[in-house]
Each structure stands twice: as C-alpha cells, then as structure tokens.
Amino acid sequence: MSRAGCIMVQGTMSGAGKSLLCAALCRIFAQDGYKTAPFKSQNMALNSFVTRDGLEMGRAQVVQAQAAGVEPDVRMNPILLKPSSDVGSQVIVNGEVRGDMPAKEYFRRKKSLIPDILRAYDSLAEEFDIIVIEGAGSPAEINLKADDIVNMGLAKRVDAPVLLAGDIDRGGVFAQLYGTVALLEPDERARICGLIINKFRGDVEILRPGLAMLEEKTQLPVLGVVPYLRVDIEDEDSLAPRLQSKSAVKPLDAAVLRLPHISNFTDFMPLEQHPLLGVRYVQSVREMGAPDLVILPGTKNTVNDLLWLRQSGLEAAVLKLAAGGTPVLGVCGGYQLLGETLDDSQGTESGHPQTLRGLGLLPTRTVFTAEKRRAQVTATAAAPFAGAALTGYEIHTGRTAVNGAPFCRYADGTPEGCVQNAVFGTYLHGLFDSGELTEQLAAYLCRRKGIAPETAAPLAMADYRTQQLDLLADGVRSALDMDAVYAAMGLHNPRGGKI
C-alpha cells in the first residue's frame, strides 16, 4: 500500500492562521478527489471534542476533519494539552487523560511521547492519500527546539515539506518571515517549499516589491498572498476575537461570562448566527449591564473560576439578575457553578481538598473525582424547551446529584441536567448545533421580553459550517499556487493550477 503524501503548515507565531489554512487545504484536497486527513501531533487548547468512540481531541483538528469530509479521529491529534493553571496542563494522550503536569515536567517527558505520535501518523498515512499537518507556535522558538515534536522536529521524522505562513494583519510580516527562516538550521530551511502572506487587506500590487525582496533574501518563493477572509469558523481559545466583549446590536442580549479558564466556548457560535440574538463575552460587573440571558460556560477549573466570580463581584451580579427573573444557563462547568455545593474533598479539581458553596441557583451538588466522563449523546429537551432535539457530547470530571426537574432526557430516557424557575443547567456541549434549541430559546426570551419572535427554519450548524468551509477553501485556492503545493507533495493537481 502506498504511503500518503503530506504537507505541513508552520507559522511565524501563534495566531498566524495555521489552523484555518490547514482546514482550507483539507477542503481543497477533498474537493479535488483526494482522501485527506488533518494531523497535529500536539495541540494546546481549551476547546475539545469527544469522538464517536469516547476519546478526546482538539477542536481545531475536528474542524479540519469536517473540512476534509471525514470522521474526526483521535489519531489526528494524539497529544492534547488542556491548561489547568498558569504553569500546568492536563495531558491527554490518544484521547485518554494521563494526568496533570507542570510545564517543566511535561517538557522533560515529551520525548517519550514520540512513539505515540508516530504510530498515530503512520496509521493515518496508510489509510489516506494526503495528510495535512499543522505546526504549533513558531519553528524558530530556539528555546524549545530541543526534542521538538510539533514543528521541524516532526517534519523531519515524517519527511514533510513545509509551508511557512506569516500574518500581515498584525504588521511586520516581512521581518517575521525573514527572521524565522534565518533562525532555522540549513536542513530545516531546505524543507520550506514556499512562504505564505496571510490575512492581507488591500491591493496586492502594493506588496510586489516587498515580495520580490523577501524571495531574494530568503531564496524561497512566495506561493500566495491570502486575503483577510471574513469566514465564521470555530477558532482556538483566547486568541479568538469573539471573546472580546462587544455591545449587543440585536433585540436579545446574551452575556457569556468570560471565565479565566473558559473552555468549549464554541458551544455558543450557533447563538451568534440567530437574527435576534446578540452574544457578548463579559469579564467585569461594569460590562454585564442588563442582559436578557446570562450564560456560564464550560471551564477547565470550576473551583478556581468560582473563586474568581466571587472576587470579581460577578457572582453577586448574576444572583441579582437571577433574582429579578433574568434567565441563566450553565453548561458543563457552568452548570456545576450554579449548584449548591462543589465538593473537591479529594483535591482533584483545585489541587487541594476543599468544599465550596456554589451560586445556589439550582438544587444540585457536585462531587469531583479523577474519573472523566466522555460520551456523544442525543437527547430531547424538557420544559420550557420541550421537544427540541439535541445532539452533543459530555466531557467532564465530577458527578452531579440533582434534586429537581431535568433539562433534557437522553435517548434511553436518562434524565440530564436541571431546571428551576428560569435557571437551566446541563453537561451537554454542542447543545445548540442542531438549531432546534436555539429557536426555542430565542422564542422563550422573546416571550419574556414581550417582543415578537421571528419564525425561521432552524439553522443546523453543520450546514452553516459547510458553507463557511467552502468560502474558506475558495479564498485560499484562488490565492495559492496550488501547482507548487501539489508538486511539493509529489502529486498531481487535478485542476491544473490557480483558478
């Protein structure tokens, strides 16, 4: 069996656009008839996903798999780091939790993970025509080059040609690209098959002199200037501009608390697409205002974020709004926060034994344990959203005892979550993706506010995502020299060049 061709996208810095460029290439190659898989050896992210077989992986590779039209597979992201503090992360290997590690300990041990990475890659390479590999940060972080497993170190091990991308939108792209190339070793520079200027706004002709000089100084071709593409595709963690607080410009205002350890905030992307719902992220009492809905999102550290809510005054603000009848929704860690007590007597969540009072808005009690529940589920919402079909996944530590009405029922009849008055809690991530709950939530908020709801067919997130991925692929295909990209992999371009 022939081994897959491959191409790797590295960047001059975090946020250079590697994830979306990889998603675009996955889409392009799939459109061209190649069976394609994404791969990132090590991803650091708070947004994660549970696969069909109950394993955990980063959402960036999930989006890339969706772009390629294939089922997300944990082999596409064998190492996932989920920050649990400023100096440590939960380490997930092949979808299973290995434990929490300080950064120094992880860097000492990461070389031992190379066999896991290569087994995952080699397995994919036997099944697919093309592997699109995403690097992390910059390959020129000279303090991190020893035992590198995610940039040039990986490229050497799998013999991958490299596209190096720089973000012109933040300025200094020529220095970024030239400096990165200059700091690489000769054999590493030889792996770069081309440079990409990413996120350009304006007339590309203005760039021509700079591009020519960059090619002369680096002795590398610029394979494309990718425009700033206004596509709405799930993005990674705190670099995401959607986390910046913004005023609601729609009839309904939803305020999502921007917790210090916020995770899986991609849950709320479908709400942003609704014509009546404005979504903003707040991290202070001053920003809170008088929303129509308060959302407590998932968090990687429920206990520490509860303490932050208390210290920031946001707990008191949420309680005041709830007492006045403002609906409150908690998802996963946010659901735990809404309960009466959070029992971390084993110290598995916060690092030392303690039991804390929750916000007390739901009749629930959560006990944290080391065991993590991971499962894809289907469910039907209960009142006041009765009948809405839900699909999503659970991914959490802790077990919650409920003394109240459920938020939904799983397909086997098992009750899940809790509802009390206008306060709702659920462990279900992705609950708005099907569109039905979004419509029912909007109608519910309209009734409470006394405004007329808009009637429209529910927007399925999968359909919207497909549309956005096609827009992304079209924009990148038209900007890149695809003949050169295919040639670097030793493959034929079915479309015969740029379009």
Kindly label every feature range from the protein language model.
Residues 339-347:
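Extracellular/periplasmic helix-exit of transmembrane alpha-helices
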Residues 1-320, 327, 344, 370-371, ...:
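Flexible phosphate-sensing "switch/lid" loops adjacent to ATP/NTP-binding sites
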Residues 335-336, 432:
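Short active-site segment of divalent metal-dependent hydrolases/proteases
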Residues 348-375:
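Conserved P-loop NTPase catalytic core
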Residues 190-192, 340, 356:
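Core-facing hydrophobic residues within beta-strands of well-ordered domains
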Residues 332:
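Catalytic nucleophile serine of serine hydrolases
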